[in-house]
Every structure is written in structure tokens, then in C-alpha cells.
């Protein structure tokens, strides 16, 4: 009986980990402005975020939803190395690379989009 329970637990864990490994998420957080200190702007994002998006590049190139009207810059984190493009054209593996789990910030146009593709 213990062996059956053990094997069932192992099978469940294997299915869960392969499902997680199959996902290649990209988190996009939108910001309206930068922080301020001592009367001047400083290079940090001002919270709260305007909007948050998530795209999955498992199936190939994906494009975000249009950015909020007040969005001025975005923070991007990819689960796997990705290539991004922000000019309305579909991303290719040869575009701007972002290493996995590295936060990158980009200035954007309100209403624009970000195209992302996994580029391992």
C-alpha cells in the first residue's frame, strides 16, 4: 500500500513539474512615472503599478495587450531567455535579448505593445 501511495505521489509531482517547465511566462509591469527624492527624480519605479500583464511564449512569438494610456515605462522579466521588440513588429530571436529572470526597464509609448519570443 505504501508503495502505491509513493508511486502516486511521484507521478503527481512529475506531472506538476513538467507542466511548470512547459510554461515560458513573461511578466510585464507598467508604470506611469519615476520616484522622487529631494525635489528631483530618481531612477526607480513609482508604485503602484498602472497595470500588469503576462504572456506565454511557449507557442512562439506573442504580443502584449496595448499599454495603458498613462504608462510611460515598463518592467519586463522572462522565465527563459527572450528577445523583445517594441515597435509594433513581431519579435524575432535576433532582436534585443533579455536573459532569464533579469528585470529590464524600457520607456514606451502609451497604447504601444511589446512583442516577445523565447530565444534560448
PLM-predicted stretches and their roles:
Residues 57-64, 92-109:
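Short, solvent-exposed S/T- and G/P-enriched segments that are highly enriched in secreted/extracellular
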Residues 77-94:
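Short, surface-exposed beta-strand/strand-loop-strand elements in extracellular ectodomains
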Residues 71-74, 104-119:
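Noncatalytic modules at the cell exterior or secretory-pathway interfaces
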Residues 8-16:
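Bacterial N-terminal signal peptides
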Residues 17-22:
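Sec/Tat signal peptide C-region and signal peptidase I cleavage site
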Residues 23-36:
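Short N-terminal segments immediately surrounding and downstream of signal-peptide cleavage
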Residues 1-8:
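Bacterial N-terminal signal peptides that target proteins for export
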Residues 36-70:
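Surface-exposed ligand/attachment interfaces on beta-rich extracellular proteins
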Amino acid at each position: 500500500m505504501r508503495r502505491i501511495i509513493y508511486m502516486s505521489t511521484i507521478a503527481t509531482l512529475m506531472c506538476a513539474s513538467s507542466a511548470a517547465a512547459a510554461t515560458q511566462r513573461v511578466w510585464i509591469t507598467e508604470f506611469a512615472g519615476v520616484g522622487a527624492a529631494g525635489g528631483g527624480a530618481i531612477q526607480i519605479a513609482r508604485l503602484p503599478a498602472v497595470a500588469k500583464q503576462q504572456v506565454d511564449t511557449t507557442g512562439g512569438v506573442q504580443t502584449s495587450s496595448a499599454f495603458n494610456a498613462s504608462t510611460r515605462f515598463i518592467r519586463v522579466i522572462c522565465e527563459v531567455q527572450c528577445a523583445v521588440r517594441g515597435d509594433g513588429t513581431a519579435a524575432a530571436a535576433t532582436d534585443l535579448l533579455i536573459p532569464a529572470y533579469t528585470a529590464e526597464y524600457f520607456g514606451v509609448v502609451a497604447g504601444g505593445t511589446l512583442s516577445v519570443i523565447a530565444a534560448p
